[in-house]
């Protein structure tokens, strides 16, 4: 683990939140000292790199969702520390200074965020976060039409009730509310769960755009390996409360021993490549993300 200057008491307005987010030897236990005690994280460390898309994978109960909640202080580690842009949150910290600023910069989107909508209009729901953090109310409201456009909803939806929308539309509104806070990092827990294929594609396109055009760091927990292959710069593999592997999607998905251990099937393209390998055509050492990449590499081999 890299050495970090601890600045626990530094004013958060002085922190550069674009720097790496480091979880250093962190642990977390649910229902401590009860018959239901469960150690979700067990003295593990990792880094979420600047301007990267990082996907976190692993079976249910491996610690993925617990780990991402440490990034913005929603929960506090029992050991080690969480470091955000040189700002250290030591284990068992009771109160984080200026926690609103921290949560502005690191926006956490839970699975099924549409259940967090509560305002009477879409405009008020999207503007709620920025206004709550001190932004001028009119300025926050003025941004809403552009945010609706970004998440592919009509701009004239501003005065509609969010409860009139479909599930997928509600999720777009909820995501727009997080983006409205204009933080450096989006932390997403199963963001496309329950969406139809068109909705999934729209969301993945949006995350790619937020990373490439808006320079947002994206941290995404998902069980959808096709999405991981499509979007990830780096993949973190969790198992029984620990990080057991970190690598590019190409490195992770070409390691069948690892995938078998964590009981995860590779993306569909890699399933096809494993079948081809059994037929004597090995493409697993190629950096293949899309069906177009696959066709190009296969054509080279078959020439």
UniProtKB/Swiss-Prot annotation:
Membrane topology: Peripheral membrane protein
CDD domains: ABC_cobalt_CbiO_domain1
InterPro entries xrefs: AAA+_ATPase, ABC_transporter-like_ATP-bd, ABC_transporter-like_CS, ABC_transpr_CbiO/EcfA_su, ECF_ABC_transporter_ATP-bd, EcfA2, P-loop_NTPase
A cellular component term, taken from the record's GO annotations: ATP-binding cassette (ABC) transporter complex
EC nos: 7.-.-.-
Enzyme class: translocase
Subcellular location: Cell membrane
Record-linked NCBIfam families: ECF_ATPase_2 (TIGR04521)
Similarity section: Belongs to the ABC transporter superfamily. Energy-coupling factor EcfA family.
Gene Ontology MF terms in the entry: ATP binding; ATP hydrolysis activity; ATPase-coupled transmembrane transporter activity
Subunit and partners: Forms a stable energy-coupling factor (ECF) transporter complex composed of 2 membrane-embedded substrate-binding proteins (S component), 2 ATP-binding proteins (A component) and 2 transmembrane proteins (T component).
Protein name in the entry: Energy-coupling factor transporter ATP-binding protein EcfA2
Domain spans labelled ABC transporter: 21-265
Pfam family, one: ABC_tran
Biological function: ATP-binding (A) component of a common energy-coupling factor (ECF) ABC-transporter complex. Unlike classic ABC transporters this ECF transporter provides the energy necessary to transport a number of different substrates.
Keyword field contains Cell membrane: yes
Keyword terms of this UniProt record: ATP-binding, Cell membrane, Membrane, Nucleotide-binding, Translocase, Transport
Residues bound to ATP: 58-65
């Amino acid at each position: 683990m890299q050495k970090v200057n601890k600045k626990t008491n530094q004013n958060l307005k002085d922190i550069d939140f674009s720097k790496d987010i480091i979880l250093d030897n962190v642990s977390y236990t649910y229902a401590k000292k009860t018959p239901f005690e469960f150690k979700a994280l067990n003295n593990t460390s990792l880094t979420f790199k600047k301007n990267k898309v990082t996907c976190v994978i692993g079976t249910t109960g491996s610690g993925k969702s617990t780990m991402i909640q440490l990034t913005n202080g929603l929960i506090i580690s029992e050991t080690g520390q969480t470091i955000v842009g040189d700002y250290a949150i030591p284990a068992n910290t009771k109160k984080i200074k200026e926690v609103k600023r921290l949560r502005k910069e690191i926006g956490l989107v839970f699975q099924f965020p549409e259940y967090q909508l509560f305002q009477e209009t879409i405009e008020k729901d999207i503007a709620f976060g920025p206004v709550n953090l001190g932004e001028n109310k009119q300025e926050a409201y003025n941004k809403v039409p552009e945010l609706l456009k970004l998440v592919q909803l009509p701009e004239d939806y501003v005065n509609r009730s969010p409860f009139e929308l479909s599930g997928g539309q509600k999720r777009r509104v909820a995501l727009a509310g997080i983006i409205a806070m204009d933080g450096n990092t989006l932390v997403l827990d199963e963001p496309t769960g329950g969406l139809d294929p068109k909705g999934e594609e729209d969301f993945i396109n949006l995350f790619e755009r937020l990373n490439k055009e808006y320079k947002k760091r994206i941290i995404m927990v998902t069980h959808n390996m096709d999405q991981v292959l499509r979007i990830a710069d780096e993949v973190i593999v969790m198992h029984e409360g620990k990080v057991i592997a970190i690598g590019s999607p190409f490195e992770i998905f070409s390691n069948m021993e690892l995938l078998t251990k964590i009981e995860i099937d590779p993306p569909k393209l890699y399933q096809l490549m494993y079948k081809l390998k059994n037929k004597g055509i090995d493409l697993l050492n190629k950096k293949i993300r899309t069906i177009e990449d696959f066709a190009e590499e296969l054509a080279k081999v078959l020439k």
